[in-house]
Amino acid sequence: MVYAHNLGFPRIGIKREMKKTVEAYWRGEISQQQLQQQAIELQLTNWKIQAEAGVDLIPVGDFSWYDHVLDMAVRVGAIPSRFKALNSNITDTMFCTARGQAPNGIETSACEMTKWFDTNYHYIVPEFTTNQSFELHHDDLFKSTKLALENNYRAKPVILGPLSFLWLGKCKGESFNKLLLLEKLLPVYAEIFEQLSSLGVEWVQVDEPILVLDLPPEWQQAFLTTYQQLNFFNLKCLLATYFGSLDDNLSLTCQLPVDGLHIDYCRAPDQLDSVLSQLPAEKILSVGIVDGRNIWCNDLNRSLTLLENIQSSLGDRLWVAPSCSLLHVPIDLDQENKLDVELKSWFAFAKQKVAEAAFLTRGLREGRESIGAELKKNEEVIISRKTSKRIHNPNVEKKAASVNERLMRRQHEHSIRKNKQTAQLNLPLFPTTTIGSFPQTSKIRCLRRDYKQGKIDDALYEEKIRQEIAEVIGIQVKLGLDVLVHGEPERNDMVEYFGELLDGIAITSNGWVQSYGSRCVKPPIIFGDVSRERPMTLRWIEYAQSLTTKSVKGMLTGPVTILAWSFVRDDQPRSQTAKQIALALRDEVQDLERSGVRVIQIDEPAFRECLPLRKAAWQDYLEWAVKCFRLASCGVKDETQIHTHMCYSEFNDIIEAIAALDADVITIESSRSEMEILKSFEKFAYPNDIGPGIYDIHSPRIPRVAEIEELAVRALQYIPIERLWINPDCGLKTRNWEETKEALSRMVDAAKHLRKAFSSEKTPTIDLELQPAST
């Protein structure tokens, strides 16, 4: 029989219950027992939503208090020794691993965090050593599975596969071949399967998303040997791939001794024919035909026609599902009461997407007539979107068509600009700055909420925001920072803020998705041509600059990041949408410069995450991404200093594209990786200024002055002294004021020590060392 199933459901809860509960636990306001009870309630709610929608096989094990990769590491005992020694409680150990601090007060350096493939979700990077051992260490998956079965759900446990788990981790200390760990790891996986089998589970979903990557031959071979060795203890295994095409890994995937294969049709429709021709006759094919990464409703008529053709070949060996876990979309469109009615009709969130998969499955089982009403209603929606006049703006399209190369070049090369900027800005050696945002207190959030709800008028709102800006400027001046920011109190999110002010973009009320841990974001929805009708940031930056003689940065989010962190229209190339955004930002940049702003930051933290997973597609993306950044940034004079910021990025393979952005200063996230990211600059002489993140803002832990100095000295191995900036890893929005002021004070002290220790006339040698400074 054709089944509807799902790969994973959002964890955060319809009202972000996960976020509120876990943060209460971190603050010591609730017990661990209360924490676990909320986990039970959230999972039961998620299972009920899916079952009522008509999903046959319910994913179990997709819930997490922080991250599913971290959960897998804890489950198999891959816990770094620095956490094992300090925590006896497994839950606190997990939180300490992710945050560098546990609710029991234990502190140490957190594990690295990075992007989950090309999404805006972040995972905690497992750490492996040459003497790594594994053991079954956590029973969370078995408890959840038992709970689902007791509540009469047909549970399909979900785990990250062994090869993807190893691939996503990193060697700590001495480098070695991670595949050597399989011998110790596979028995633990077998133990997991044995326990799931004993509970009466029929199917297990094993996620191996790295099968859509360019894999080295030894990793391809490792798939064959690993899955031949794995003992599933009579469980049926659905091997799940997503985010791209199997491509050259298709043949080996079809040889694996598993019972079913899931493919992502939405991201890689061209692979379908090859999969159908190579899939062994006994295997199930799960077709991910409902987009798990975007919010547009499915064209059910078109999808059903495609599935009917597949069914004619496979019969009951066809399953229907979303393309990937629904972790990447909001939970329930029914919670949106303020969206324009026509726009809302075009969307589908997680609850609606599992219903779409179920509708299609029913159509296959019982014939089109059984879902005739749904098909008719859906067809009306599809036509409405295609013919709506609100999507196209002739003025925007004309402006985009007129873009030429001249608009994407600064007046002179960086060396000339550098001299002019140095004379104008009068900055010291090792200039200090922050990335943009300052702590968003409950007072600020309540102020914005009251303003949006009409409880306070424009005048009072402006007065209160100005007070916040003045306070932030005063704190930075007192701390001794060199280039200041206004703190962004008016912004709820670095992308959503611009989404609210640009035409062609819609904002939801409850469209939250998980970014990392308890951090949730509300991505804008780009539904039509994008344009700027009026200045978006000017009044706040002008006011901030009026309070100080030091330079205050204009703060913008770049075109690629706005694109990456939004749900994007799918009726034109993404590059075209990015160009429209870049033109809107260009107007804003020029307005800021005309007002006297001397430093303008255009953040592109998502620049690398948008890189296609397959290298063959990189050149095309990098070409248009670089052009869009330059289109946004190059309309200014030499004297205006352009900054950009990037995070969670490995630069080795795209360093030339980073240089091609031609930003005067780039700040990058690097502290968690202990400056490893700077190895990119060993063989490539990056020509412009760099500010490698000198402390980790994602952890509440405050670094010692000596630690900051040590990282800066390490950075000087790769960056000439006259080009090195001192700054945090990222924005400070999620930190509290006590942490922020103390950490920045230490950062400024470290910069002062560095200025004393290093001559401004000479570039230091690599082996020059500082004595540890006191804190």
From Swiss-Prot:
TM regions (residue ranges): none
Keywords: Amino-acid biosynthesis, Metal-binding, Methionine biosynthesis, Methyltransferase, Repeat, Transferase, Zinc
Gene Ontology BP terms: methionine biosynthetic process; methylation
Residues binding L-methionine, per UniProt: I435, G436, S437, E488, D603
Binding-site positions, Zn(2+): H645, C647, E669, C730
Pfam families, sorted: Meth_synt_1, Meth_synt_2
Domain of life: Bacteria
MF (Gene Ontology): 5-methyltetrahydropteroyltriglutamate-homocysteine S-methyltransferase activity; zinc ion binding
Binding site for 5-methyltetrahydropteroyltri-L-glutamate: R16, E17, M18, K19, K115, R519, C520, W565, E609
Pathway note: Amino-acid biosynthesis; L-methionine biosynthesis via de novo pathway; L-methionine from L-homocysteine (MetE route): step 1/1
Binding site for L-homocysteine: I435, G436, S437, E488, D603
InterPro entries: Cbl-indep_Met_Synth_N (IPR013215), Cobalamin-indep_Met_synthase (IPR006276), Met_Synth_C/arc (IPR002629), UROD/MetE-like_sf (IPR038071)
Catalytic activity annotation: 5-methyltetrahydropteroyltri-L-glutamate + L-homocysteine = tetrahydropteroyltri-L-glutamate + L-methionine
Similarity section: Belongs to the vitamin-B12 independent methionine synthase family.
Name under which the protein is recorded: 5-methyltetrahydropteroyltriglutamate--homocysteine methyltransferase
Species for this entry: Coxiella burnetii (strain CbuG_Q212) (Coxiella burnetii (strain Q212))
